[in-house]
Regions:
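Residue-level signal for well-ordered alpha-helical segments
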Residues: 1, 9, 59-61, 68, ...
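Short secondary-structure junctions
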Residues: 2, 70-78, 120-125
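Membrane-embedded segments
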Residues: 2-20
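Extracytoplasmic segments of membrane-associated envelope/inner-membrane machinery
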Residues: 14-98
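Extracytoplasmic/luminal low-complexity segments enriched in Pro/Gly and acidic/polar residues
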Residues: 103-141
Length: 141
């Protein structure tokens, strides 16, 4: 529950309005809401992307998740899990694993979005992982 409003509407009537939290991702085994708030773990089985953050910076992780989701939608990839380390970020998608250094993460994702469909045509087999840590291209498995 994010908020509760209680109003007295008639001499003996109370109006209670409950505003629920909206879960966005699983963050280090807890729930991250759509506004970036981290709340306690849920016993319910939720089908949400997972963020494993070894830097323990929930706000930065939320920003990384939003950026990644926005860019990967352009190439029809869904995020299953993101692992954020001090120097690298690993994104596990519905189809493959993406690896990037943190410093150039946004630039690397943008390069991938521009070239992804060409890579799929060039490699006529399934691409398991794309390492974007190289400034002049990608390492593809």
């Amino acid at each position: 529950i994010r908020d509760v409003k209680i109003k007295k509407s008639f001499p003996d009537t109370l109006e209670i309005i409950i505003i629920p939290q909206q879960p966005y991702a699983i963050y280090n085994s807890k729930i991250m809401t759509i506004d970036g708030t981290v709340i306690g773990a849920s016993s319910m089985q939720l089908d949400l992307p997972i963020i494993i953050d070894h830097t323990n910076d929930s706000q930065s992780s939320m920003n990384t998740m939003i950026l990644t989701s926005k860019l990967l939608k352009k190439i029809d990839l869904d995020i299953k899990k993101i692992e954020i380390h001090d120097s690298i970020i690993k994104v596990f998608t519905s189809a493959n694993i993406l690896i990037s250094d943190r410093v150039n993460y946004e630039n690397n994702l943008n390069r991938l979005v521009v070239t992804f469909h060409d890579l799929q045509k060039l490699f006529k087999r399934e691409i398991k992982s794309i390492d974007m840590r190289y400034s002049n291209g990608f390492a593809i498995k």
